[in-house]
Design a protein with these regions (language model features):
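N-terminal Rossmann-like FAD-binding beta1-loop-alpha1 element of flavoenzymes
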Residues: 2-30
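Conserved Rossmann-like nucleotide-cofactor binding loop
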Residues: 12, 36, 249
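Glycine-rich FAD pyrophosphate-binding loop
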Residues: 21-46
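Mid-domain catalytic core of redox enzymes
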Residues: 23, 219-337, 342-348
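Conserved flavin/dinucleotide-binding core of flavoenzymes
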Residues: 43-45, 99-100, 302-407
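Dinucleotide-binding Rossmann-like beta1-alpha1 core, especially the glycine-rich loop
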Residues: 48-125
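Short loop/edge segments at beta-strand edges and connector loops
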Residues: 82-84, 214-216, 222, 232, ...
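Active-site/ligand-binding neighborhood in enzyme catalytic cores
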Residues: 94, 110-227
Length: 407
């Protein structure tokens, strides 16, 4: 029997624990520094009991595995939602769907200019340029939309000018999309769901039968002759395998310096059910679930109406309106310019037999639930090889488990 310690009881840790217990003979201990499992995926509540989420808000197949839907349905019911997103390009402009469409753009004061630029691009029939992100956007959606929809947001959230970012950043997010009308959804073309009762029941059911030790802080890991030890504020735990979803730089004592992140803090308001759609509606009458505000003059990047997400079109009663404000102290989104530092950490982790960094924090990768499950599946498939490999082979396996930005 393999003794496994999982550091972190968020979705990556819980998913890995459940998957490995289902496939191999093992004893698993899960360590979580918070008082409850769930990590960024927990459903939180205001003082008056109204629910909201800090992290992911819906479930879909974005760019990971389609197995995510049946996997989650083992534990919770999934209620389909129409998730539309909008943008207000300037304070005085109306809200329009995002990704933008020509029908909505025409109603803007600058609509004719945007349409002329898009027409010229399409008539030229040349592929977008890829020198940098500005070049890519201006050659695919035109200078005006580039400035209004992307320039301010990138400076505000990522802290970088468009010309300092790679074209791949836009290609990954499909920022070039401008339809004639009606593409109101998220980058996922698959249906979107919200779990019945929120996300917390998912963890309550996934973690049944596990030794979950909440309120336990991990201070380090170290290689020993017979395996690996996890050092905590409650003592030392010996293991054959440690799956660490904690920040990889902190776990390895910032040997190469701290990794840079982007994130946000939140502000909450409550809207009553008689106030109408909190963020406006799309042309087909569906209320927007969230709204981007890309101009530099506001610190707010995005606002979410949880009445739409939690209750659907038949909403009733008050709901939370949540604003996301840039805060670099919150480690949510990895940045591309830290790849070199991250791979130093990954190589360092590979030199510790039995240590597997995993998830958003462990593998320094932006993930969704479907891509997290895909990551766990790749780990499970390669675990036997990993345990029998040398440091160089383990590094290659970890790179494969992480995947690229598209998986």
């Amino acid at each position: 029997m393999i003794e496994i310690v999982v550091i972190g009881a968020g979705f990556a840790g819980a998913c890995a624990a459940w998957t490995l217990r289902d496939q191999i003979d093992c004893q698993i201990t899960i360590l979580e520094q918070s008082a409850e499992p769930g990590g960024m995926l927990r459903t939180l509540r205001t003082g008056d009991g109204l629910p909201y989420e800090y992290g992911p808000r819906v479930v879909s197949v974005f760019r990971g595995t389609h197995d995510i839907i049946p996997f989650l349905q083992r534990f919770v019911g999934l209620e389909e939602r129409q998730v539309y997103q909008g943008t207000r390009l300037l304070p005085e402009y109306p809200v329009i769907p995002f990704p933008v469409d020509l029908e909505s753009v025409r109603a803007l004061p600058c609509g004719r200019r945007i349409e002329r630029e898009l027409t010229a691009i399409r008539e030229a029939q040349t592929p977008p340029r890829e020198t940098n992100l500005r070049d890519y956007l201006e050659s695919s959606v035109g200078p005006t939309l580039t400035e209004l929809a992307f320039e301010g947001f990138n400076r505000k959230f990522w802290g970088r000018r468009l010309e300092d970012m790679p074209a791949e950043w836009g290609k990954l997010r499909r920022l070039e999309r401008v339809s004639e009308s009606g593409l109101f959804r998220l980058p996922s073309r698959a249906p979107h769901y919200y779990p019945s009762g929120g996300f917390n029941p998912l963890f309550e059911r996934m973690l049944v039968g596990f030794d979950v030790r909440t309120g336990t802080r991990v201070t380090g890991v170290r290689k020993e002759r017979r395996g690996i030890e996890v050092v905590t504020d409650a003592g030392v735990i010996a293991a054959d395998l440690v799956i660490a979803t904690a920040p990889v730089d902190a776990l390895l004592e910032y040997e190469f310096g701290p990794l840079e992140w982007r994130g946000y803090r939140i502000e909450l308001d409550v809207v009553e059910d008689d106030a109408g759609p909190g963020l406006g509606t799309a042309p087909d009458g569906v209320p927007f679930a969230w709204l981007y505000t890309p101009w530099l003059g506001t610190p707010v990047c995005r606002t979410t109406d949880f009445g739409v997400i939690h209750q659907g079109p038949g909403r009733s009663g008050p709901a939370v309106l949540l604003r996301e404000i840039v805060d670099e102290g919150v480690p949510m989104y990895p940045v591309w310019w830290e790849d070199r530092r991250f791979y130093k950490y990954l190589a360092r982790a590979a030199r510790i037999p039995g240590l597997v960094p995993l998830g958003r924090l462990g593998l320094y990768k932006y993930v969704t639930m479907d891509s997290t499950l895909a990551m766990v599946q790749r780990l499970a498939e390669s675990l036997e090889s990993y345990l029998g490999s040398d440091a160089g082979q383990r590094l290659e396996i970890l790179r494969s488990v992480r995947g690229d930005w598209q998986t």
